[in-house]
């Protein structure tokens, strides 16, 4: 019989609204025996059943909910339903040649990410309770893809994020099943990329910016473009493929720059798109001092904060990078700026960019606001699923 977790009085509103997490400070009592990773029943303070989830006393996220139905068996049939729904959603909303097939809590499979790069799957498991289901879900996903004529060539696990330690889990990296060539060529928005699922960041590629990159193609045509924190050259190459006159990509990682140059070669853009290894925060003032100006500046920095407590310092970081970027935009040019931190809200990022514009005597005209691609769905009951904010502005000098 499953252990029963009873919440404190007044807690459980997030769960009732459809959220997935129960934190350690929300729990009143736990009745019955359990091991970490086990499925438990969750009740509110008055004993009303709220659903089932897996428990982990090593984590502040004590329970991750799997279902609101206490009579629901968490078995292969249940997992098959979740996987099928996730794949059907992607087929409806995005180009599925390369996409995020499972996005954790937003697909009601908390703690699990699966990315598809053509015929390769990359798995990231961030929750102890999901470990027991991981390989079953991979098997079910392969079956689901096969129904659409997609044969999976190989599966690689990239469960090597620091979040694993918060769950009391070791970092894991390696093949699930037979070994295979882990270099995969994908095509997105007309651009070819070599994705290294073993050594690339996260699962090898940032799929969440897919349609934001596409949105920049129109703006970059015929323009001089600076792409900061370029990583594998994604925004820079979208600019190049759209007909930008000259594109420079900057990244601090030598490996990333090597990959970006290889991607430029694959697309025949070596003469137009150039990459340099540089610390962006140091390089932008040097470019400004030398008199460089660009029609388009793209700022896609790593997350400056991964916790609420670090938000204050993150604001300073975003303000600094946007000030430095704005100084390089020609009058009438364009700035694309974003944050991939959940804790940097849309309102907070907008306020920070507005302050940067004021500090540089620039006026901003918003072209559009965008967020993560639909294969990274935002579950309104789970705030943590909304993390990417992407602004495009026209930049006008004060006159």
Identify the function of each model-found stretch.
Residues 1-118:
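Non-catalytic accessory regions of SAM-dependent methyltransferases
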Residues 174, 178-399:
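Rossmann-like S-adenosyl-L-methionine
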């Amino acid at each position: 019989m499953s252990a029963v977790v009873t919440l404190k009085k007044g807690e459980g509103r997030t769960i009732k609204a459809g959220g997935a997490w129960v934190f350690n400070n929300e729990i009143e009592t736990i009745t019955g025996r359990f091991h970490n990773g086990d499925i438990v029943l969750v009740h509110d303070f008055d004993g009303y059943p709220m659903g089932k989830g897996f428990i982990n006393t090593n984590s502040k996220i004590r329970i991750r909910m799997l279902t609101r139905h206490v009579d629901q068996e968490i078995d292969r049939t249940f997992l098959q339903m979740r996987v099928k729904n996730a794949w059907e959603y992607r087929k409806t909303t995005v180009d599925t040649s390369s996409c995020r097939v499972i996005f954790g809590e937003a697909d009601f499979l908390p703690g699990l990410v699966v990315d598809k790069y053509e015929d390769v799957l990359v798995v990231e498991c961030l929750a102890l309770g999901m470990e027991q289901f991981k390989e079953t879900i991979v098997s079910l996903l392969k079956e689901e893809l096969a129904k659409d004529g997609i044969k999976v060539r190989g599966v690689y696990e990239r469960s090597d994020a620091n979040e694993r330690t918060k769950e009391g889990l070791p970092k894991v990296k390696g093949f699930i099943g037979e070994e295979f060539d882990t270099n995969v060529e994908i095509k997105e928005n007309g651009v070819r990329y070599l994705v290294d699922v073993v050594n690339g960041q996260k699962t090898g590629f940032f799929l969440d910016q897919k349609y934001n990159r596409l949105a920049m193609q129109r703006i970059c045509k015929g323009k001089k473009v600076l792409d900061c924190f370029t990583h594998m050259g994604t925004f820079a190459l979208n600019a190049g493929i759209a007909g930008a006159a000259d594109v420079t990509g900057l990244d601090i990682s030598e490996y990333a720059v090597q990959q970006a140059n290889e991607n430029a070669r694959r697309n025949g853009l070596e003469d137009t798109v150039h990459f340099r290894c540089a610390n962006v925060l140091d390089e932008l003032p040097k470019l400004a001092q030398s008199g460089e100006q660009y029609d388009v500046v793209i700022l896609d920095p790593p997350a400056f904060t991964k916790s609420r407590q670090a938000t204050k310092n993150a604001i300073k970081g975003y303000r600094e990078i946007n000030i430095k970027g704005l100084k390089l935009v020609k009058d009438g040019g364009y700035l694309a700026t974003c944050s991939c931190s959940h804790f940097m809200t849309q309102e907070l990022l907008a306020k920070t960019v507005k302050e940067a514009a004021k500090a540089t005597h620039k006026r901003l005209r918003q072209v559009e606001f965008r967020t993560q691609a639909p294969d990274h769905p935002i579950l309104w009951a789970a705030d943590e699923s909304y993390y990417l904010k992407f602004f495009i502005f026209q930049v006008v000098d004060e006159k």
